[in-house]
């Protein structure tokens, strides 16, 4: 028999956060999150997303042991913007037992209906910068620090329970070109764009050089991403939170800011050296030795994770991506980088996918957002 309990205290929250560490203990492809980040994100008093979200967490027990977990989220900003009265589910994990998964979904759906929702979709976080999308292809590919990994049976369970595909993201593995002709072609396209549209690269020597541009970066992010699936604006309070969380993981070599003729930001790329191996070895903890592994990964790495890329909407088609790619490709080659992993891109986002046409690429993972409308 399965028993469901709402998370109401610290010990239950600890069980909620650490359950995947046991579920994926022997899985070489799962990348653990930082436990401290999970505690912050799920804390209603600290995470500024709770200014416009409400959420509940549940644990499933079978034979006296934790067998699954799920979060239910109502994002009021999403409902106001998109007009869909959908709840979200996230932080979904369970053993391969349909009785367990059904109990979890029964619980979150009942909660959503009580709140007046007309459907539920996920896996999604509080906002678009949280992890999202259930893995449906690429189970034998190493995950990244910013994406969800799950077992193949998750897909079978959720589809059996009546959920259908609502959106799909692809992840692209990009080989850094060593062919001089390819590199020269990218540089030529960048030079042409610089000359024609007055574009220039902002010189950055230290992390602190990025700080004056942070408000402009997030303002552009909100505008460039506003039409993407489920996206809601990032608030000023959230900006401060994300900067505090991730700024220490930045290597300024891989931050690219492009200015337009008017001196304002035309586009940006935020790339983070892969933290996957460091996270696995640290088992979700920065201390006592985890931070050393993270620092080493940030300073020297042959793999990059493309975290965020955005272009000013009115400057699309003006060569901004070429300038960005030229700068980042030359830096990557200089630092011995072999490959880059693009963060999830909607399968319908052909504009972003076209950025990689001069590179050798392969789609190595797919992830999906599922939807269930209530009768």
Residue ranges, per PLM feature:
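A structural motif corresponding to the C-terminal lobe/cap of the Radical SAM core domain
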Residues: 358-360, 364-369, 373
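Acyltransferase donor/substrate-recognition loop-hinge adjacent to the catalytic core
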Residues: 148-228
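A conserved beta-strand-loop-helix scaffold within acyl/acetyltransferase catalytic domains
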Residues: 20-62, 70-80, 204-309
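Catalytic cores of nucleotide-enabled group-transfer and carboxylate-activating enzymes in metabolic
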Residues: 10-13, 33-36, 43-44, 51-60, ...
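Generic start-of-chain signal for non-secretory N-termini
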Residues: 1-29, 375
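Short beta-strand-to-coil "C-cap" segments at the C-terminal boundary of structured domains/repeats
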Residues: 174-177, 371-375
